[in-house]
């Protein structure tokens, strides 16, 4: 009862702030998020668990097959064991295939019945939809843009209408707003394209701003259980050599926070993919090939 009274008091305080004329409009998503947390009095996960209890739990579920979130690319899934609450970063220079890969992964996860929210801070939803159509139909992006698809190809798009995949523009928005929208949509997975474009007020220093954004995305994943997939730009010198985690633009915090990092690079028409951080599996060549015409990644034949 005491905990419930405290939660109500906290909720009322936040509600008064929300209707206060002095409260900035951009602060409302963060207040909305805090109000939801205030009413949830049963999410505390900080209590101790003995190793014996943890061992019993492990043995009890020994015969259950792990339920990882699949990407749809078998070579990636062999090593990238994504679970709810992970923070997965896909880094690359412009035109290395970051957006194409993220859309393909989002579609693959939606096909599994996962509710996926895709937040784009750079590209409008209609342009992303064109890339997604090309990817799913194995059709040239030019045919999609010029609207020269056959009726047979158009008929094959019917399944896409049933996917729980939602795309929206997030230009100029911050992490609190993204979190509030994802919670409103009951998302299992959210994509952000891309991290360095997220707007956070209050920090004039770019390094500190990106550091705070990465920390906030990591906390979002951990506190909500949503799988967060964030695209990230690489520094310009990454174009001249095989990229590494240190090339993640403007902050080393991204490397610190991420559960896994996949870096994409290109040399002319040849594309490379490498897992450079992976808490739950091996690192190294991810074994992916990119067809820019079809906007589609496939597993390399070995």
Tell me the role of every PLM-derived stretch.
Residues 8, 70-73, 126, 151-154, ...:
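Amphipathic alpha-helical transducer elements in NTP-driven molecular machines
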Residues 77, 108-186, 200-201, 286-292, ...:
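Cytosolic-facing regulatory segments adjacent to core modules
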Residues 45-139, 176:
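The Walker A/P-loop phosphate-binding site
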Residues 79, 95, 149, 212-302:
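Phosphate-binding/switch region of NTP-binding enzymes
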Residues 89, 189-191:
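Structural motif
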Residues 1-60:
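Short, small/acidic-rich helices and loops at N termini and domain boundaries
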Residues 194:
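Walker B catalytic acidic pair
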């Amino acid at each position: 009862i005491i905990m419930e009274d405290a939660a109500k008091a906290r909720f009322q305080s936040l509600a008064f702030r929300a209707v206060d004329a002095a409260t900035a409009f951009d602060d409302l998503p963060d207040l909305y998020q805090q109000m939801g947390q205030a009413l949830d009095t049963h999410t505390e996960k900080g209590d101790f668990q003995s190793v014996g209890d943890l061992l019993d739990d492990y043995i009890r579920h020994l015969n259950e097959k792990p339920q990882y979130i699949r990407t749809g690319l078998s070579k990636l899934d062999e090593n990238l064991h994504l679970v709810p609450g992970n923070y997965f970063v896909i880094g690359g220079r412009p035109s290395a295939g970051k957006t194409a890969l993220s859309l393909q992964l989002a579609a693959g996860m939606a096909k599994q019945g996962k509710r996926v929210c895709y937040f784009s801070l750079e590209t409008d939803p209609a342009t992303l939809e064109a890339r997604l159509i090309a990817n799913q139909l194995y059709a040239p992006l030019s045919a999609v843009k010029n609207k020269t698809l056959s009726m047979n190809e158009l008929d094959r798009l019917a399944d896409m209408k049933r996917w729980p995949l939602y795309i929206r523009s997030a230009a100029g928005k911050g992490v609190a707003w993204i979190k509030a929208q994802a919670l409103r949509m009951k998302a299992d997975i959210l994509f952000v394209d891309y991290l360095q474009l997220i707007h956070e007020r209050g920090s004039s220093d770019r390094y500190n701003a990106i550091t705070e954004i990465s920390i906030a995305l990591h906390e979002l994943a951990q506190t909500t259980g949503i799988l967060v997939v964030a695209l990230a730009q690489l520094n310009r010198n990454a174009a001249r050599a095989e990229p590494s985690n240190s090339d993640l633009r403007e902050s080393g915090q991204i490397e610190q926070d991420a559960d896994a990092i996949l870096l994409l690079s290109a040399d002319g028409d040849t594309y490379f993919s490498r897992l450079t951080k992976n808490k739950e599996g091996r690192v190294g060549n991810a074994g992916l090939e990119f067809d820019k015409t079809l906007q589609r990644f496939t597993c390399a034949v070995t």
